[in-house]
């Protein structure tokens, strides 16, 4: 049984607080409480008929990630953990996140209702360093939560590829091969993957479900196939 110290966070909107607690509750429910075979993590975005937006995910990892809840206020000065040439910013929004191995933000929500979820993707290839600033993958989700209120804002910024992501080896010796899903309070969604050294973005409300491998374009193709053979009934 894992124990978590819940931080006190003062967000102005009660509705956002309820959504935050529900989303984090769903995330924590997926964390492994005992050793078990690894299965695929899944992120799901649901918009109810009354407009309520909920993002949930399972964390089907092969070991205890020693996760904790971290609460960050707005105004924190940060850098991307990439040495001398790394992005530097000051957080515009407060956030609550679930840590991974206590070295980075695996997922979370900011005070505007923007949610970020990192899932494993074996096909990730971040490319070669090319002189751009370098951002550690442990700060990728936090970079988004700190600076953007909506999915559209994040997409507009990240599609410019202002940095290169670097992925150090995890404490268990595995590579940190991840893709990023984000959603906001309106139900908008985007998926970010590095495939063949290039950033690929899928942006739209229809991208509501993401799992691990294969890459997201192939996940969409598989979904289309199963719909044609009665897999949705």
Describe the predicted segments one by one.
Residues 2-22:
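Bacterial N-terminal signal peptides that target proteins for export
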Residues 19-33:
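Bacterial N-terminal signal peptides
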Residues 33-39:
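Signal peptide processing junction and immediate N-terminal pro/mature segment
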Residues 39-133, 160, 165:
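A contiguous strand-loop segment
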Residues 47, 131-164:
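Alpha/propeptide regions of enzymes that mature by internal proteolysis
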Residues 155, 166-174:
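Surface-exposed patches in mature extracellular/periplasmic domains of secreted proteins
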Residues 171-225:
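Extended amphipathic alpha-helical segments with heptad-repeat/coiled-coil character used for oligomerization
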Residues 224-233:
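Long, charge-rich alpha-helical interaction segments
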């Amino acid at each position: 049984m894992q124990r978590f110290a819940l931080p006190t966070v003062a967000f102005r909107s009660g509705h956002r607080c309820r959504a935050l607690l529900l989303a984090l509750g769903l995330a924590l429910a997926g964390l492994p409480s005992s050793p078990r075979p690894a299965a695929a993590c899944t992120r799901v975005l649901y918009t109810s008929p009354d407009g309520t937006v909920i993002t949930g995910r399972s964390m089907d990892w092969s070991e205890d990630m020693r996760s904790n809840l971290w609460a960050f206020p707005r105004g924190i000065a940060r850098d991307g953990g990439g040495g001398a040439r790394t992005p530097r910013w000051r957080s515009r929004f407060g956030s609550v996140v679930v840590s991974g191995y206590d070295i980075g933000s695996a997922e979370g929500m900011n005070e505007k209702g923007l949610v970020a979820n990192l899932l494993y993707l074996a096909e990730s290839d971040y490319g070669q360093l090319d002189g751009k600033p370098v951002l550690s993958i442990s700060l990728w989700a936090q970079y988004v939560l700190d600076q953007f209120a909506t999915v559209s804002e994040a997409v507009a910024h990240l599609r410019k590829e202002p940095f290169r992501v670097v992925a150090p080896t995890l404490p268990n010796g595995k590579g940190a091969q991840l893709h990023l899903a984000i959603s906001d309070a309106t139900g908008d969604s985007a998926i970010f993957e590095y495939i063949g050294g290039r950033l690929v973005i899928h942006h739209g409300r229809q991208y509501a479900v993401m799992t691990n491998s294969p890459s997201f374009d192939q996940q969409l193709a598989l979904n289309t196939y199963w719909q044609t053979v009665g897999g949705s009934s």
